Structures are given as structure tokens and as C-alpha cells.
Amino acid sequence: MNSIFPFNDYIDLEFYLYEDNEYKKVLVNLLELTKYIKASKFYFGDYYNDKLGDFNEDKLNEVLNCNWDKYENYFLTLHGIKNQFFNLRISPFLKEVSVAKVRIHKAIFEKNKIKILDKCNNISEYSSTMYGFADASVSNPYFYKGYGQIKFGAHWLTWYGEWALQYFKDKHIEEIKDNSYDFVKKETFIRSQLYVSPWKYRSKQFHKTYRNFMRKVKIEDIVLEYNKKHEFSEIEKKN
């Protein structure tokens, strides 16, 4: 029997959260994504204790309203149907980066993708120093057929899938030209130019500088700059 977990059946949404004054609003909105996993198990506690109890909405609300100063390095975990889950690790040191991850079954994500992306947009409006990604290039085989990697934050960045590209155009979230799609396979460039590890840079000044920079930059300008620096072969263009 094949025991390998079927990652291709899931979409992972991952968020890096900076704990500012809007953190609670971000968390409340983030947890609204968990309705899609239909949680049945719940845990909130120390990193080394992974015992799950029955899901209790009152307990969840209690956690949301607690004093977070007491809970550095704690985990909030919700487990749902079809191996779906929500995890939040509160940062080891307050005012630094916490990590949240939602794993949603691909069929459920596909059915509710616009609502899910709208919710992610709401999250980013509350916390412009927060960003995250749905790494569909890793988690499902249909990456080039429809899904892309999406980062949520002060600026929306994406390895554009076809429906995602149309969604961003329709919502006017970002000014995108069709030639942005040529960029889809240039992972090294995108990571080096646009993705900055939250673990390396934690200061408020960094987040402020990064946010201001991303508000000014335009995706099409980056694509044009990249095209000037790199000559694509005819084979690359056809592929």
C-alpha cells in the first residue's frame, strides 16, 4: 500500500503575521477561512503538547480574546475532514513573526476559490505587514493549468495561473498585463527579487520600508525590467 500523503490533492495557504495593533482583526478574519475545513478537533497550548480535544467554538472564542503576552511559542490547531487543518504558531518573541497555515482540499478550494481569495484580501487590508503564499506549484499538479503562487500582503504578488490572472484583473487588485504570464517559470528571479524571508528581517523599520516599496512597484515594470536583463530563447518562449 502506498503510504505517501497525497499532497497533490490539497492547497496550502501560508501566512506570516506581524503582531501589530491590528493582529486580533487579522486573526479573526484568518480563522474564518477555517470554516472550509469543517473542524472537529481543537488544541491550544504549549509547542510540545499536541493532544487534540473536541472542537469547541466557545473555547476558540476564549483563545481569541486572551492575553497573547502569556502565550509565546504556543500552538493553535484545528483539524477537520479530509485531513484538512489550520495551524497557528505564535511567535517565540512577541512583536515578531508568527506563522499560520491552512490546508484545504483541492476540490473544496476550487468550489469556493473566489470567496477564499476575497477573504485573503480582507486579511491583507488589516495587516499590510503580513504576507503569505499558496504554493500550488508544489502542492498540486495543475499549477500551470490554473493555479499560481499567491502572496498576500501590502502588495499582491503571484506566479499567475490563468483564472487567478483574470480574477486579479476583474477585482482591480493589481495592474497586470498579459505578458506577466511569461514570468511564470522564473522562480529563482521571483524569489530573489520579491520574496524576503520574514525570519531574517524582523524589525518594524524593515516591515515599513518593505511595505512602502511594494506599494510603489508595479508588476509590469518588474516584468519589463526582467525581460531586458534576460534574453529568452525561442524554445523558452514557446514553452
Model-derived segments and their meaning:
Residues 1-43, 140-239:
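C-terminal interaction module
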Residues 28, 35-144:
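Internal, hydrophobic cores of structured domains that mediate oligomerization or house catalytic pockets
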